[in-house]
Amino acid sequence: MLLLAASAAGYAQKPRPEKLDRGLVVARGNADGSYFASWRLLATDSPSISFTLLRDGKPVKENITGATSTAVEGKPTSRWQIVSLRDGTAIDTTKAVLPWQQPYLRYHLQKPSAGKDYDYTPNDCSTGDVDGDGQYEIIVKWEPTNAHDNSQDGMTGPVFLDCYKLDMTVPANDPKRLWRIDLGPNIRAGAHYTQFLVYDFDGDGRSELMCKTAPGSRDGRGNYVNQASDSKDIRLADNGRDWRNSRGRVNGGQEYLTVFDGEDGHAINTIYYMPNRNTGYGRDAPGTFQWEPKSRSGDNGDNGNRGERYLAAVAYLNGFDKAPCAIFTRGYYTQAFAWAVTFDGKRLHTNWFHESRDKEQYSVTDSLGRKNTYNAPAPTSGSGSGTLFANGNHNLSIADVDGDGRDEMLWGAAALDDNGKILYSTGYGHGDAMHVADLIPENAGLEVFDVHEKKKEYAWDIHDAATGRIILKGGPEGIDNGRGLAAQIDSTTGAFYFWSAGDSDIRSAADGKVVSGIRLPINFRIYWDGDAQDELLDGVNIRKWNAGGSKLLGIFGDVDNERKRTLTARNGATGSPMAKGLRSFQRPSLSFNGYGNPASNNWTKNTPCLQADLFGDWREEVVYRDRDDNSTIYIYTTEIPTAYRYPTLMHDHVYRMGIVWQNVAYNQPPHLGVNLPKEIKSSRSANY
């Protein structure tokens, strides 16, 4: 068994990890009535820390120094605890938890009342510790069934945000709801509108929630959010007015940003959202601004497409020893704006405001209101936009890519430095998906795999996350490449591979060579079965790449009888470890069907409500809605043993920021800021 301590490189120059408890969970086994216990190792733990597992107050396994999970025997009424020991002396004992009685947790939620022609389903979720007890809560976005994409007309029902307790001490089917926020009629429902951030913004140990609001939005106490403003104009706005036009577009009225208390949901502070739909500040802002270039047909606020595309993230822009910033953006097909905001516990403040109104110049307004205009650097590809203009994706990522102790914002085909200035642009234009990780261990730092929707010369590229230097580029010319994935599917090499919808060949991130023509899922990656490689999460199935060809997953379901997909070897791949893995790939390797009635979200995106390391050891949990009962969600956790002891993924900064932005627009999976197989190889081994 391998003992993995967090490497100094992996956790240096990062924020202080959030305070979490051991996250002990005990779930019923698949068939024989046994249980599987799993708990957190923290990045702050000493490498010599050990654990004792208690059942009904008596030791079951003592001085555990290996993996923080184990199979155990018990009863449905057994109460379990973890004792943490330093040099053999107990330093902490967890609260007692009751076991799950299935290999999953079923939560019955309080669904909002249906409207005249629509109902509600749980959609994107997020997580944060809203009450400071070291346990995560879950925040659920309720999506009306008449939600629309920005390209579509139509009325929608209001969006609701709920917060529920995740209390593992008594895993009841009916969790306690802490609050509900009603965003009202003037926030349209759809994937591109409500991007909500759950994080501890003021450093008090409790998470807040931030999102875009409007007149008519109500907080967790039922009060209108505009009453939490210092602005008289905002407080006097008409909360009874419906600003939607006959096409269902919200083309007028004030637009706000509100920060909500995480524990009871009350609105703490509301300010004008920057920019408004006319790219100005405040007031009712009737939609007249042309978001398309003059050479094309107009897209103003009445049409509500280009100017209603939002993204959001959390980033440590002022240093990891300072409070984090919320970043809210508007537009990416053409004009693009990014607004960094801080929260001091009482008020929201602008950190900086970035404007990319064309391809050659951009401006940044600082916290004191001083605006400076800059010429953009030349795109690293040699052509295209040099600013955020037309270079954004339907998603974004956050990481300290240049090692200065401050985060940068990865925009797709461009990046912003911590001060709001352009770090670089590749010029490759708009894309649907991207992945930021240590894709190429031989290249210092992180890399970006970007999938291009813009019909240009290349369908994808990999570029250096710090400099924008193009490392690889390729794929069919002139296509709309809608989706792609980069993952470490072969732990024997520790290498990343990538593939996409428009270029399904599997390629090595190291050199771009095709290793197979087999088609793999292009949705999420996940750590599930306990090795150091990624599994592939697609809908409610986890698909497994078995490099040795010796094992298939079956803990949650039988392996599909579909014929094995045989490798079409190219570029000398025959006989390589990768090729052997391809030969043994079967699908699906694991299905959640039969364990509850789970369903994925967001149409062809096939995404879960949430994927995150919510509790237990370093493997990830998955949250799904019920296929038929719109009041129910499921939380699944792995019960497969692992040989590795590793800190909770939530203490990896890049990963934690990824959980915050996961709900944004076209959801993307989180990645680590370190190369996990490389971390394992560099860690000391021990025989346990």
For the regions a protein language model found, what residue spans apply to each?
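Bacterial Sec-dependent N-terminal signal peptides
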Residues: 1-13
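Generic detector of low-complexity/intrinsically disordered segments
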Residues: 3-6, 26, 350
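Beta-propeller-forming repeat regions
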Residues: 17-23, 34, 41-46, 52-56, ...
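Short, solvent-exposed loop/linker segments at the N-terminal edge
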Residues: 27-33
